[in-house]
Amino acid sequence: MSAMEKLRLGVNIDHVATLRNARGGALPDPVRAAVLAEQAGADGITAHLREDRRHIRDADIAAIMEAITIPLNFEMAATDEMQEIALGHLPHAACIVPERREERTTEGGLEVAGDDNRLAQYIAPLKDAGIRVSLFIAAERSQIEAAARIGAPVIELHTGAYCDYDAEGDVAARDAELARLIAGAKLGVELGLEVHMGHGLNYDTVAPIAALPEVAELNIGHFLIGESIFVGLEAAMTEMRARMDAAR
């Protein structure tokens, strides 16, 4: 991929739904957030329908798809229920993520290398339906190679550890994790995969990731929604977009 190619920004609106569900009502509406994100220049919207429905609800998916003209990236666990929902809605993309009920957010990458036969069979109907499948994985050679082996066209590399080390001020660990992400992105492209990255990115951590020519898309949610409380979603996205473009 050319280093001059525009880096896409996918905006995850899950935590608008988290705030809505804290009171059990209808507001703030994640569908409105998706529309505003599109108006502010998002290249796609990401929404994760978790098995416990802790933020996004079933009805939100159809409503978001009806309200936006940009692609929806539907995050989902590799369960029969979620496969049925994805095939019913036919979003542009489906990102398969690991899920544990006790976690606050997606804590690790999907285990592909040890579950490749099942996952190959699982993603086949999604691909056949025209859904672009991605796998949310750690930047580990075994996982990236397994993703390519089972026929997933896209991987999203987990940037959470890199961002956590940065927040803790552990420069050595942060830089080591960044090196892993760089190597993972290069390997992914070598294997014919489209490479995305996401999880925990903010204004301080986005530039080194955005600078990688192998990366086609970043998915950012929690930070943008949090920042929007203070400056508004459009301003938060504009600043993020500027930092991404400057790094490119």
UniProtKB/Swiss-Prot annotation:
Gene3D superfamilies found in the cross-reference section: Aldolase class I
Record GO terms (molecular function): pyridoxine 5'-phosphate synthase activity
EC class of the enzyme, as a word: transferase
Annotated site residues (Transition state stabilizer) in this chain: 156
Binding site for 1-deoxy-D-xylulose 5-phosphate: 14-15, 50, 55, 105
Binding site for 3-amino-2-oxopropyl phosphate: 12, 23, 200, 221-222
Catalytic residues as annotated in Swiss-Prot or TrEMBL: 48, 75, 199
Gene Ontology, cellular component aspect: cytosol
Domain of life, per lineage: Bacteria
EC number: 2.6.99.2
UniProt xrefs under InterPro entries: Aldolase_TIM (IPR013785), PyrdxlP_synth_PdxJ (IPR004569), Pyridoxine-5'_phos_synth (IPR036130)
Catalytic function, reaction form: 3-amino-2-oxopropyl phosphate + 1-deoxy-D-xylulose 5-phosphate = pyridoxine 5'-phosphate + phosphate + 2 H2O + H(+)
GO BP field: pyridoxine biosynthetic process
Pfam families per UniProt: PdxJ (PF03740)
Compartment(s) where it occurs, according to its Swiss-Prot or TrEMBL record: Cytoplasm
The entry's keywords: Cytoplasm, Pyridoxine biosynthesis, Transferase
UniProt cross-references to SUPFAM superfamilies, sorted A to Z: Pyridoxine 5'-phosphate synthase
CDD domains the UniProt entry points to: PNPsynthase
Pathway the protein acts in: Cofactor biosynthesis; pyridoxine 5'-phosphate biosynthesis; pyridoxine 5'-phosphate from D-erythrose 4-phosphate: step 5/5
Function: Catalyzes the complicated ring closure reaction between the two acyclic compounds 1-deoxy-D-xylulose-5-phosphate (DXP) and 3-amino-2-oxopropyl phosphate (1-amino-acetone-3-phosphate or AAP) to form pyridoxine 5'-phosphate (PNP) and inorganic phosphate.
Subunit structure: Homooctamer; tetramer of dimers.
Family: Belongs to the PNP synthase family.
Name of the featured protein: Pyridoxine 5'-phosphate synthase
Source organism of this protein record: Jannaschia sp. (strain CCS1)
Name of the gene this protein is made from: pdxJ
